């Protein structure tokens, strides 16, 4: 594994990595994270009883929109034309948590790890925003890259 930081020049200045000589290949990234909430909040989400509306539906759209706009949020992130993206939710009533999984796909010269991570993060923040009136103790956490496929560095599995 190459441990060299790529977003700095030899003087320590931040730069956007030059990907012009890289090959376009299919790249896939999967990220995940959780929102822990009270059992009452989880039940309100499951029964679509949150006053602001369909929590998971809105969070799904927000996460996908975030993936498409990642380069506007992360300064050195390249803009990419995402070819596929999804946000999925798994509610675990025993743990009182919602697991969010974001998948991002592209055929490009650079990967989409940041897009998947941003999708999870914004979906989680949207859940928090929509439910904060009933539960201010929600905890967003465990956001990480699960899998990366394609590109020069090959496959990564957490």
Curated annotation (Swiss-Prot):
Signal peptide: none annotated. Pathway: Cofactor biosynthesis; molybdopterin biosynthesis. Disulfide bonds: none annotated. SUPFAM superfamilies: Molybdenum cofactor biosynthesis protein C, MoaC. CDD domains: MoaC_PE. Pfam families: MoaC. Keywords: Lyase, Molybdenum cofactor biosynthesis. Transmembrane segments: none annotated. It catalyses: (8S)-3',8-cyclo-7,8-dihydroguanosine 5'-triphosphate = cyclic pyranopterin phosphate + diphosphate. It comes from the Bacteria. It is an enzyme of class 4 (lyase). The active site is at 129. One of its GO terms (molecular function) is cyclic pyranopterin monophosphate synthase activity. Its EC number is 4.6.1.17. GO terms for biological process: Mo-molybdopterin cofactor biosynthetic process. Catalyzes the conversion of (8S)-3',8-cyclo-7,8-dihydroguanosine 5'-triphosphate to cyclic pyranopterin monophosphate (cPMP). Homohexamer; trimer of dimers. Belongs to the MoaC family. This is Cyclic pyranopterin monophosphate synthase.
